[in-house]
């Protein structure tokens, strides 16, 4: 079929999708024979690149505002579709003096008693999972006190590496990464209450000029086969599409 004759479309996906979308893409390839090129990074960096004309075909953001801004700039075919709602939590590596505590009570105590040297979050300037971590720390009244201890990851996947490598005492990462066996085995994880931050409304959109294979994958993400994988990685499925 003509689908298979094309070069694989490029998907720019937020780093929280690293494990989930690799699995969805593998199933899509098995079901359709169509290959995809997956590129992972922070939603904000991809937004800037697409604005400057980067050759991406499907943009899967962790924050819907970036999608709306691209749509307003005339870069997309429409305003896209909500595909998942993400969650954040605290991960502490084995051997850390911190406890995995989603309400930051132990983190607050550790700031006072000197147990905390370094704590990882994604850069809130361009990584939505970092922006939500900042909101949660603000909610807990710890944002100012924790400033000197923060180590910023370029995206949430690098943040997960920082938080589990032993170079920090822990960090705030995506539930979807904590659910991956390769990350889960590195430490203990606790969800942060969802009311402590703005919801991580994850929206995807086709970029103007996207080939049919990109649209096929866009539609595939809404199928039960794909959603079953997303749910396994801790994503909530949006009510409105």
What do the predicted segments below correspond to?
Residues 1-2:
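Bacterial N-terminal signal peptides
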């Amino acid at each position: 079929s003509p689908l298979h004759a094309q070069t694989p479309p490029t998907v720019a996906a937020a780093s929280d999708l690293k494990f989930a979308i690799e699995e969805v893409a593998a199933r899509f390839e098995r079901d359709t024979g169509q290959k995809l090129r997956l590129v992972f990074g922070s939603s904000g960096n991809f937004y800037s690149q697409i604005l400057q004309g980067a050759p991406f075909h499907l943009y899967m953001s962790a924050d819907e505002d970036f999608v709306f801004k691209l749509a307003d700039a005339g870069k997309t075919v429409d305003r896209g579709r909500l595909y998942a709602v993400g969650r954040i939590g605290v991960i502490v590596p084995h051997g850390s003096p911190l406890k995995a505590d989603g309400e930051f009570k132990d983190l607050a105590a550790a700031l006072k008693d000197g147990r905390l040297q370094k704590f990882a979050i994604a850069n809130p300037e361009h990584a939505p999972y970092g922006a939500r971590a900042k909101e949660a720390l603000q909610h807990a009244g710890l944002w100012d006190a924790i400033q000197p201890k923060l180590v910023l990851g370029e995206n949430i996947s690098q943040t997960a590496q920082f938080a589990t490598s032993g170079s920090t005492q822990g960090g705030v990462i995506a539930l979807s990464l904590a659910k991956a066996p390769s990350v889960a085995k590195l430490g203990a994880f606790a969800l942060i209450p969802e009311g402590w931050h703005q919801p991580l409304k994850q929206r995807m959109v086709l970029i103007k000029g996207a080939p049919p294979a990109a649209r096929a994958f866009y539609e595939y993400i809404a199928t039960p086969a794909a959603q079953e994988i997303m749910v396994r990685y801790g994503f909530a499925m949006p009510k409105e599409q």
